[in-house]
């Protein structure tokens, strides 16, 4: 059973009850689970994750997400705000806006992000990107701490960083995976940023939010990586001086 087949579970269970093989691994282009109120089995009553997107369109060569979660689609902002409001009323004080690539969030009425170019004039005019959503969440819930993860360097915008600096309740922390400090390896990974572009983004973040914490994801030993490529990664880490990272 695939992750988007939950609505078909009664039928699948019925097939199993009748000694039939039950399979449904079809990935939806519209399902965002926005109409489901999560049951938080392991909760501390303080912090919670709130999903804002599903899937991914980036097709990094080391990642299976596009094949297991499907095309990127964004959740209705009203549904997101309702879930956060429910958490606030239950006493939660911190939420993390969650997505494979939160900065790529784009709501224009529903559907995959790749189809946005086909949207009507009104849909495009009324669309919301991640900076709009982040601003809405921080403004509507000033007593809650707001975090978000994960950001992709190719989609992280100055607007998002400026919204962070505008609201005291948005934590000054960005998880910004680079994966490698070598342009040659980044190309093999099908990453859509270069070393220079990444470092320029880091510079911009620290100009706007000098005390911003920054963490990373890094892959070493990627197929074809040379000692020179590895040294490029080490030099990038030395230049950025991350607060912590996943390797």
Which residues does each predicted region cover?
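OB-fold and OB-like beta-barrel modules that bind single-stranded nucleic acids
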Residues: 9, 174-176, 245
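Proteins enriched for Cys/Gly/acidic motifs involved in redox and nucleic-acid/cofactor modification
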Residues: 1-105, 129, 159, 196-207, ...
């Amino acid at each position: 059973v695939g992750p988007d087949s939950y609505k078909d579970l009664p039928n699948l269970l019925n097939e199993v009850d009748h000694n039939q093989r039950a399979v449904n691994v079809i990935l939806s282009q519209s399902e965002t689970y926005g109409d489901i109120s999560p049951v938080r089995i392991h909760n501390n009553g303080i912090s919670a994750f709130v999903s804002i997107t599903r899937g991914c369109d980036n097709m990094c060569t080391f990642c299976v997400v596009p094949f297991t979660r499907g095309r990127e689609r964004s959740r209705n902002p009203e549904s997101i705000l309702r879930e956060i409001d429910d958490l606030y009323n239950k006493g939660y004080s911190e939420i993390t806006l969650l997505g494979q690539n939160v900065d790529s969030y784009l709501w224009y009425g529903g559907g995959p992000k790749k189809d946005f170019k086909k949207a009507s004039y009104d849909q495009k005019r009324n669309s919301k990107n991640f900076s709009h959503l982040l601003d809405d969440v921080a403004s509507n819930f000033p007593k809650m701490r707001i975090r978000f993860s994960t950001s992709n360097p190719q989609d992280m915008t100055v607007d998002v960083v400026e919204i962070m600096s505008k609201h005291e309740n948005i934590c000054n922390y960005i998880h910004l995976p680079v994966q490698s400090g070598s342009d040659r390896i980044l190309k093999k990974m099908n990453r859509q940023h270069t070393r220079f572009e990444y470092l320029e983004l880091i510079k911009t973040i620290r100009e706007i939010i000098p005390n911003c914490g920054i963490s990373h994801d890094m892959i070493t030993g990627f197929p074809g990586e040379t000692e020179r490529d590895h040294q490029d990664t080490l030099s990038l880490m030395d230049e950025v001086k991350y607060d912590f990272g996943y390797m």
